[in-house]
């Protein structure tokens, strides 16, 4: 119990130190607000923990005969509540935020995803925080120019495309933006087409596909207005399985995709993992949060590199499950057969497309030190039976 309390106190001290150390810098406001979210979360968990154990502490001091019973009860609570996992999960997220901020500032850091020890994770976070402070101390001479603020009434100015600059909504002052070209296509729709945002977020695509590959998406995605729960689809698939004498335990992603094509429901190809779980009772492996975060970090870097090395003449369209397949094939050890089952739930495209993707992936790996390139092995499924 004392060990758990010490861990909570170490985490609280870490958050306080980071907040006080970075509060003076505007560029860290977003980072601090995200860290405060985790700080409030860990405080609530700590409060709940103390509320649970306090009655047992009172009983422990009431007599020697009750102490062993009380200690056993506290140990049971710690196991049931899974306190260590909650602390560790929070610290993994915090370390990811700090490491991501350092990478934005151009500072290279080592991957620190392997440990599940909360005290080591606190030490890691403290080291990352010190690197942030060192980076800031080297760039203190750099000043931030608040060019959007009106110099007369100090309110935020807005873009005025007709005047090619910023205009204050209060006093009407116009500030010309030197060296800036305004393209009307960024501000208006043409031919009834919807204007697209210029911000591309690889993390959104990663989370969408991970959710579907691991079968965590909503079961309502299988349904229609006439069949909200997707019962009809599952019944149709079961009829085909019975007709073809298929073994349910050996069903694969490709089997499900072929059956969906037969019943004209290829719109459910993204839900194959969920369908497999509903039919077989066995779902994809539950990958730990630290591995998923590491995969997200590498995925984001890979997409950025891909935009630079993309071959001319190829359609600018990514098949994101391929990237996820290659990343997890590389970061999961060969003997980790449990987690490597995730590869079974990722559909790979045809041989020609796969060869082109492998060639492109080789170029990406040359600039991605976390991944060592190797050709895609379609026979991965045989390694898990």
Swiss-Prot record:
One of its GO terms (molecular function) is zinc ion binding. One of its GO terms (biological process) is regulation of viral transcription. It comes from African swine fever virus (isolate Tick/Malawi/Lil 20-1/1983). A zinc finger (C2H2-type) spans 166-190, 168-190. Induction: Expressed in the late phase of the viral replicative cycle. Pfam families: A2L_zn_ribbon, Pox_VLTF3. Belongs to the asfivirus B385R family. Keywords: Late protein, Metal-binding, Zinc, Zinc-finger. This is Zinc finger protein B385R.
